[in-house]
């Protein structure tokens, strides 16, 4: 074990070795994945914030950076130094949101680096400006979970509340995207999934129905229909978190009321517009809708996803609809569900056909109803590492040595969270 790891992390690994003494190979993989994030992606900044790159791309995604450090919330409960590192990330995330709440990925400094010279309101801090609902949900979720797991509230500072105002403004605006949104995005000479149609506004949706518009999915692919149901589910969860935070802090009655009302509005819209009936199965949640009656029935490996509904904390009005949805997306009725000789599961249009993502296999395990299924998912992940000892993005279903992204910290973190849950280490919510 690396002596450079925080003592709390070393103690967690030793505890897992005791719990899994008959399967040391699981802990070996866990240790590699768990230490990889701290060793290779995390940087403490001079201003006290924490910058976390996604892996083999030198930029910080608001979404990925939360997922990367989320498994450290457990040891941070008794490790103030590790907790400071996490608090630094929260501070950095809200600094970024205050720069531009429509951007999904940010540079370490104001250096002008970017993925592409896109036609949108870019700035020198912004690596990419794809507006995704989840990019605003994840920092709110992390701030809340940090409070619940460490008891700390110093993250709820002026920078946080300024960011909250921007998040609520964006959500309100994007409920009426067609009429009110200032956002557009055009990328030239690219796949259609990397840009938005209609001069950068995206496919038309019905405004004012209570759903929040998103330009892009958590895969960074453009939405077919702008009302992305899993991301709206995530918004409901974090808006309720925000209401609880505002009530606890005090003096934020207006924000608490706005968050509560918005959560109710979005949830009602999900249950009204976000479901459809499948013959022989019943009612299911769609992945995307436009409010005019068109539905996109699929699921994507990236989180938020329909598969991750319970993991995110969304409570459906009907558990039967949620169960039907799970059956649908874990079958070939989902166009991105693939089966091969080595692996079966959910992939993404972001990667080649017949590539299953390690993230989706981890979510399948985290949301599985039995410990036996969780154990099976752990072993499927380990058996498809391509001999690297780490997780990847997409893995070819017939040959695990063929994969995308050798260094993908988000997937490593998801494997770790699954192992921790299997061994009884739950992140407090």
Tell me the role of every PLM-derived stretch:
Residues 117-124, 129-132, 296-316, 354-429:
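C-terminal capping/lid segments that line or modulate ligand- or cofactor-binding pockets
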Residues 62, 101-102, 109, 115, ...:
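Extended ligand-binding clefts on enzyme/binding-domain cores
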Residues 36-47, 111-119, 205-217, 387-393:
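Active-site-adjacent bridging/hinge elements
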Residues 10-13, 27-35, 69, 73, ...:
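Hydrophobic core segments within long, regular secondary-structure runs in both alpha-
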Residues 1-27, 89, 167-170, 175-190, ...:
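Long, acidic, intrinsically disordered low-complexity segments
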Residues 1-63, 88:
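Low-complexity, Ser/Thr/Pro/Gly-enriched N-terminal "stalk/linker" regions
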Residues 8-22, 67-80, 138-153, 233-252, ...:
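Well-ordered alpha-helical scaffold segments within catalytic/enzyme domains
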Residues 58-86, 90-194, 408-425:
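Aromatic-rich carbohydrate-recognition surfaces in CAZymes
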């Amino acid at each position: 074990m690396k002596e450079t790891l925080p003592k709390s992390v070393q103690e967690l690994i030793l505890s897992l070795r005791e719990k899994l003494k008959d399967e040391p190979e699981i802990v070996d993989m866990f240790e590699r994945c768990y230490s990889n994030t701290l060793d290779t992606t995390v940087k403490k900044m001079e201003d006290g914030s924490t910058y976390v790159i996604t892996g083999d791309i030198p930029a910080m995604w608001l979404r990925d950076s939360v997922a990367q450090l989320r498994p450290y919330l457990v040891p941070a409960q008794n490790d103030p130094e590790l907790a400071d590192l996490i608090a630094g990330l929260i501070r950095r995330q809200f600094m970024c949101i205050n720069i531009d709440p429509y951007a999904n990925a940010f540079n370490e400094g104001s250096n002008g680096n970017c993925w592409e010279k896109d036609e949108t309101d870019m700035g020198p801090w912004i690596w990419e400006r794809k507006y995704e609902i989840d990019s605003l949900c994840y920092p709110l979720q992390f701030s809340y979970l940090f409070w619940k797991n460490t008891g700390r509230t110093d993250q709820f500072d002026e920078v946080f509340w300024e960011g909250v105002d921007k998040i609520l403004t964006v959500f309100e605006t994007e409920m009426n995207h067609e009429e009110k949104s200032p956002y557009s995005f055009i990328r030239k000479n690219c796949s259609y999934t990397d840009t938005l149609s209609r001069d950068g506004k995206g496919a038309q949706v019905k405004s004012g129905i209570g759903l929040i518009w998103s330009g892009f999915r958590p895969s960074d692919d453009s939405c077919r229909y702008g009302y992305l149901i899993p991301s709206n589910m995530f918004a409901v969860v974090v808006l309720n978190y925000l209401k609880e935070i505002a009530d606890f802090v005090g003096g934020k009655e207006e924000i608490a009321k706005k968050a509560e009302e918005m959560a109710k509005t979005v949830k009602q819209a999900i249950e009204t517009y976000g479901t459809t009936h499948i013959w022989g199965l019943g009612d299911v949640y769609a992945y995307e809708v436009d409010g005019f009656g068109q539905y996109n029935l699929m699921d994507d490996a990236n989180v938020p996803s329909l598969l991750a509904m319970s993991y995110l904390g969304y409570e459906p009005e009907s558990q039967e609809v949620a169960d039907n949805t799970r059956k649908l997306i874990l079958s070939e009725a989902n166009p991105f569900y693939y089966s091969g000789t080595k692996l079966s599961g959910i992939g993404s249009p972001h990667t080649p056909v017949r590539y299953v993502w390690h993230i989706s296999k981890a979510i399948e395990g985290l949301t599985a109803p039995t410990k036996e299924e969780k154990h099976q998912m752990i072993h499927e992940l380990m058996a498809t590492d391509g001999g690297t000892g780490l997780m990847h993005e997409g893995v070819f279903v017939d040959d695990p040595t063929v994969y995308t992204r050798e260094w993908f910290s988000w997937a490593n973190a998801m494997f770790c969270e699954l192992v921790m849950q299997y061994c009884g280490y739950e992140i407090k919510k």
